Amino acid sequence: AMALPATKTVVAMKDTTNADITIKVTGYQWKWGYDYIKGEGEGISFLQTLTTPREQINNQLAKSTTYLVDVDNEMVVPVGKKIRMVTTANDVIHSWTIPAFGVKQDAIPGFVRDTWFRAEKIGTFYGQCSELCGKEHAFMPIAVKVVSDADYATWVADKKKQMASLADDPSKTFTMDELKVRG
């Protein structure tokens, strides 16, 4: 009596087809990389790193209300849309986890895993890497900002303009000092 309903539920949980947006998430020590690879926002790419000041971490400043979840670039998605997450890792095993969305997906070097979620409320939602990944593991937050369709379209346009302004001129000749700064 339970086998058929349970099987249908598990199959639906793993069904990543018909997604509105597909985002590749790459775990790095100790940050996340996001590449919007299909749907509105295709071509957007950025890193997400912790911005909590070291003084708070070292107890030299009072802790903020977003202690250890402040990030420089939130992942942005529209409310009510099916978001497919394709996860992998660059170095060690990580796990992209947002409890509010019921998502915990391991990111494993050399493997591509996928899952999906649909955020039903506008707001900012936080998570953490939930796989011990090294000495800075505790400093690897995740922030997802869920916005209206109109706000998402505005964010996409603004982000693409920002990326275009930061893109290099392909004919530019770099000095040695410029190359050193870039790594």
Regions found by a protein language model. Give the residues of each.
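Non-transmembrane, membrane-proximal soluble domains of secreted or membrane proteins
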Residues: 1-183
